């Protein structure tokens, strides 16, 4: 189980890298759950992380249902140096729209560099934003050629993934992903009391920010908290 940590700046990226995070995820929480950062920020953090042998992911935003816009944004993240390109399917209402979004994104990214991984991200609190259910995503995004399916939370109000999806539904999501040949990632205000449950669910990747910040998700990432998390996950 790899740990993905989401810094907002180069200074935070250094904390995450030196704390031992597996994947450095470049996002901009000021623009939403999967808010996009600027290409030059992605590039700078990518160049830094690669020196330490770390992989980089980058979010393209909580996207409306606009496949062309999503494809262009995804290519931008790929060109800027991201190994994983993560697309938030915020405005997507059903499996058919998810397929249409992701097939364009996959082509844009893979035509540029076939080694890069495409991540389709749904939301555990989908019912609060009138979005597609995560359980409808694995088959559709696998058919589109995505590599990873993820679930996060859209509204960052202190509630977690586990407040919005039953354990059985998360288990089903993980199984559907694996049955469709996808890697699977779980995120959404993960806290210390979720770690053992996550080990049992055994996703390929967990995504965090709040748990490794000195205060809430808008405060600074601290390397000692990243170290503590890595020990908890792999201990």
Swiss-Prot record:
Catalyzes the formation of 4-(hydroxymethyl)-2-furancarboxaldehyde phosphate (4-HFC-P) from two molecules of glyceraldehyde-3-P (GA-3-P). This is (5-formylfuran-3-yl)methyl phosphate synthase. The keyword Lyase applies. The keyword Isomerase does not apply. It catalyses: 2 D-glyceraldehyde 3-phosphate = 4-(hydroxymethyl)-2-furancarboxaldehyde phosphate + phosphate + 2 H2O. It holds the Pfam family 4HFCP_synth. Pathway: Cofactor biosynthesis; methanofuran biosynthesis. The lineage of its organism: Archaea, Methanobacteriati, Methanobacteriota, Archaeoglobi, Archaeoglobales. It comes from the Archaea. The active site is at residues 27, 86. InterPro entries: 4HFCP_synth (IPR007565), 4HFCP_synth_arc (IPR035081), RibuloseP-bd_barrel (IPR011060).
